[in-house]
Amino acid sequence: MDSNSWINCPPVFSSSPSSRRYQSRSDLYLGDVEGEDDLKAEFMCPFCADEFDIVGLCCHIDVNHPVEAKNGVCPVCTKKVGLDIVGHITTQHGNVFKVQRRRRLRKGGYSSTYLTLKKELREANLQSLGGSSTFIPSSNIDSDPLLSSFMFKPPSAIPITEGDSVAQVSPKDTSKSKIQQESFSNEDQEKAKKSKFVRGLLWSTMLEDKF
């Protein structure tokens, strides 16, 4: 089975029913499709009338209409679905996903709408894990002083002026220096832990985008 199905939406890390739905949808087979030019490029959301391609529509319904999606009209076949519209689309209309993938490959990428929906799903996943719901892309790292301080600032050092020598340092000064060094050391350790967490989060996000 091809792992490059529509569910290039970020992986869901919880064991909730929605995560199991995503996993089952990731098993769609993508191959040659007959009459792909006859299929619509976009479909209207049955709940808010916005138009998306089939991939974007499924992401949109899962994010914005999870409750309504349990009962509604399929936008592809216009039949009334009594349970899980997105599950119905992915299982009964897999050929549409194949067509959309071919069209995306010909155009050379994904639409900004799809990328926005993908980001929303990632933020929802982080929220479900009790983490922050704000995702900061690598291009915005420089504009975020807190994140920048975690990732790029070297450990602080105690300045030493010319003329200072070991002989000139009294025991009292040495004691103060040790306290300062311990304080800096604790602060650096805390920054290192935060930096490691942020780097791991950014790396996992970049790997998701690649695969």
UniProtKB/Swiss-Prot annotation:
GO terms under biological process: blue light signaling pathway; red light signaling pathway
Query: How is this protein annotated for GO cellular component?
Result: nucleus
The record's function comment reads: Involved in both red and blue light signaling.
Could you say which protein family the record assigns here?
Belongs to the Di19 family.
Q: In which tissues is it expressed?
A: Expressed in seedlings, roots, leaves, stems, flowers and siliques.
Give the start-end ranges of region Disordered: 163-194
Question: Would the keyword DNA damage turn up in this protein's UniProt record?
Answer: no
Annotated keywords: Nucleus, Phosphoprotein
Modified residue annotations for Phosphothreonine: T113
Annotated signal sequence is none
Subcellular location as annotated: Nucleus
Q: Name one Pfam family in it.
A: zf-Di19
What gene is this protein a product of? DI19-7
Record field: compositional bias (Polar residues): 167-186
Per the record's keyword annotation, is Phosphoprotein included, yes or no?
Answer: yes
Induction annotation: Induced 3.1-fold by red light, 2.6-fold by far-red light, and 2.3-fold by blue light. Not induced by abscisic acid.
Briefly state the modifications made to the protein after translation.
Not phosphorylated in vitro by CPK3 or CPK11.
Q: What is this protein called?
A: Protein DEHYDRATION-INDUCED 19 homolog 7
Disruption of the gene: reported phenotype: Plants show a hypersensitive hypocotyl growth response to both red and blue light.
Domain of life where this protein originates: Eukaryota
